[in-house]
C-alpha cells in the first residue's frame, strides 16, 4: 500500500499513519447512513487514493449505497490497480471491492470483466508464491453472464477458461455461470465436466446444481446422471445427494430413497436422510417416519434429519406417533434428544407461554 503525506488545515504535512486513520474513520462513519454531498466527495477522493485498503473501503460504500455518479471513478480505480499490481494492490483488496461495486452499479462492459477474469497475481509467500486473484476471477466470471454484446456461443467459449482454472472456487463460479446461461449447449458442457470424474467434490456439487437447474428437456436423464454419483465416494456422493434434494423433484426423491434402501454407513446414511427431508416432499417425510417405526438402528438418524428441518408442533406430533409405534427405548431416547419438550414449536413450549 502506497501513501502520500496529507496536508493539514494549517499547511503542515500530517504523519502518514494519522492521515490514514483519519480518512479510514471518515469512510467507516458512512457505513450505516446515506452519504451527503460532502460524504460523496470524500468517497470520490478515496477512490483516487494510492492506498488499496482505503480504495476498497470507498468501493464498498459505492456498492452499498449504489452511488452511480461515481461509476467513472470506480472504473478508473479498477484500471489503475492492474499496474504493478503486487506492489499497488497486495491481496487484490482494491480490485475485489471495485469489481463488486461495478457489478452493483450495473456496469455491463464485458471488456472490464474479461480483464479481471484473465488476471493472475502471484505474490510471495513462505516457500514460494501464491496467486491471490482467485476471488477477482470468480466475481468477473459471474459478472460476464449479464454483459451486453455476448452471444450464447461466445459467452460459453469464454466461460471455458474459468471452468479450467487452477483455483477450485473459480471453477465453481464458472459452473454456476454456465448454468445461468442455460440451454442445451450449457447442459452438454456441464455434463462433460461431470462425466470426466476428475473434479474436486465441491466443484462437482456446483456442476450438479447448475446442470439440474437447466431446463433443456431431459430432466429425468439429468437426475439419473447425478444419482449415479451416489455410489461415487463419500464427498462426491454427498454433493450429489444435496444437489438432488435442491430440486424438490419427486424423481430426485425416488433416487435418494432407492439409494437409502440399499444401505449405507452411518455417515452417508445421515447424509441421505438429511437430503430426503430437504426435498420437503411429503413422500420423503413418510419414508423417514417409516424408518423410525421399523428400523431401530436407523431411526436416530431419521429423527435427527427431521429435527434439523422441521420443528413445528404438527411435525413433532407426527414423529411422536411413529416413535410410539416403534415401541423401542432407544428410539424414544433419540426422540427426546432431537425433539426436546422445550424446543420451539413443541406442545410444552406453547404451554409455557
Label the predicted regions.
Residues 1-12, 346, 353:
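N-terminal amphipathic/basic-hydrophobic helices that include classical n-h-c signal peptides
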Residues 7-8, 242, 254, 284, ...:
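Short stretches within intrinsically disordered, low-complexity N-terminal or propeptide regions
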Residues 36-40, 71, 110, 114, ...:
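Core helices of alpha-solenoid repeat scaffolds
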Residues 49:
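Glycine/alanine-rich phosphate-binding loops at beta-alpha junctions
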Residues 73-80, 97-104, 112-115, 139:
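Generic beta-strand or strand-like secondary-structure segments
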Amino acid at each position: 500500500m502506497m501513501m502520500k503525506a496529507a496536508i493539514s488545515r494549517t499547511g503542515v504535512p500530517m504523519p502518514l499513519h494519522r492521515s490514514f486513520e483519519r480518512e479510514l474513520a471518515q469512510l467507516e462513519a458512512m457505513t450505516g447512513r446515506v452519504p451527503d454531498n460532502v460524504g460523496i466527495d470524500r468517497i470520490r477522493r478515496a477512490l483516487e487514493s494510492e492506498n488499496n485498503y482505503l480504495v476498497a473501503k470507498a468501493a464498498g460504500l459505492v456498492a452499498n449505497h449504489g452511488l452511480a455518479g461515481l461509476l467513472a471513478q470506480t472504473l478508473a480505480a479498477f484500471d489503475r490497480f492492474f499496474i504493478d499490481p503486487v506492489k499497488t494492490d497486495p491481496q487484490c483488496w482494491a480490485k475485489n471491492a471495485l469489481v463488486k461495486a461495478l457489478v452493483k452499479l450495473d456496469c455491463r462492459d464485458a471488456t472490464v470483466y474479461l480483464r479481471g477474469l484473465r488476471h493472475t497475481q502471484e505474490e510471495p509467500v513462505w516457500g514460494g508464491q501464491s496467486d491471490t486473484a482467485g476471488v477477482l476471477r470468480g466475481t468477473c466470471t459471474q459478472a460476464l453472464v449479464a454483459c451486453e454484446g455476448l452471444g450464447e456461443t461466445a459467452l460459453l467459449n469464454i466461460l471455458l477458461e474459468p471452468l479450467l482454472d487452477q483455483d477450485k472456487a473459480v471453477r465453481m463460479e464458472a459452473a454456476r455461470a454456465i448454468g445461468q446461461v442455460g440451454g442445451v449447449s450449457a447442459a452438454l458442457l456441464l455434463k462433460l465436466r461431470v462425466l470426466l470424474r476428475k473434479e474436486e467434490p465441491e466443484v462437482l456439487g456446483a456442476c450438479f446444481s447448475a446442470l439440474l437447474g437447466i431446463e433443456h428437456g431431459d430432466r429425468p436423464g439429468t437426475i439419473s446422471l447425478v444419482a449415479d454419483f451416489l455410489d461415487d465416494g463419500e464427498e462426491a456422493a454427498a454433493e450429489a445427494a444435496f444437489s438432488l434434494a435442491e430440486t424438490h423433484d419427486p424423481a430426485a426423491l425416488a433416487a435418494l430413497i432407492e439409494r437409502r434402501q440399499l444401505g449405507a454407513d452411518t455417515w452417508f446414511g445421515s447424509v441421505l436422510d438429511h437430503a430426503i427431508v430437504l426435498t420437503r416432499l411429503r413422500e420423503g417425510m413418510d419414508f423417514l417416519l417409516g424408518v423410525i417405526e421399523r428400523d431401530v438402528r436407523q431411526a436416530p438418524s431419521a429423527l435427527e434429519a427431521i429435527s434439523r428441518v422441521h420443528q413445528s408442533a404438527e411435525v413433532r406430533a407426527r414423529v411422536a406417533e411413529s416413535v410410539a409405534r416403534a415401541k423401542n427405548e432407544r428410539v424414544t431416547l433419540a426422540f427426546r434428544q432431537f425433539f426436546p419438550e422445550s424446543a420451539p414449536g413443541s406442545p410444552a413450549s406453547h404451554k409455557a407461554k
